C-alpha cells in the first residue's frame, strides 16, 4: 500500500519538474530577449565602453558582421491586413565563447561592430560564469540610461501638453 502511494506521488512530481524546467527556460529566454532589447536601443560607443570594464573570455566570430535588408511589415490600425511597408538595413553577427556559448546580434542600420558586441553580450549572458558581471556592469547601466532618456523625453512632451477642454471653456 505504501509503495502505491509513493508511485502515485512520483507522477505528479515529474510533471512539476517538467513545468519548473519549462518556466526556467522561458525565464532565461525572456531575460535574453530583454537584454537584446536594451543592447539594440543603446549606442555602440556606450556598449563598447561598458564591455571594456570586463575581462572578456576568449571568443571567436562564427559569422563575421554582415549587412543586409529585411522587409518591414505593417498593419493599418494595428489590426488590419498586413502589407509590406518597405525595407530596412540590418547588421548581424554570431560569436562563440571558448566555453561553448553562442550569441547572436542583430541591429538596425549598418553598424557591424555593434552587432558583434551585441552577439558577444548575448553569449556572455548565457554563460554561468559571466552572466552576473555582464548584467551589473553592462546591461543595468545601459537600461538605466535608456530609462532616464525616455523619462526626460516624456517630461519634455508633458511640458508642451495643451488641455483643450480648459482652453475652450474659458473664464466668464
Predicted feature locations:
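Structured beta-strand/loop patches that form or line metal/cofactor-binding pockets in enzymes
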Residues: 53-98, 104-105
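N-terminal, charge-rich interaction modules
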Residues: 20-55
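Intrinsically disordered, low-complexity segments enriched in serine/proline and basic residues
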Residues: 1-4, 10
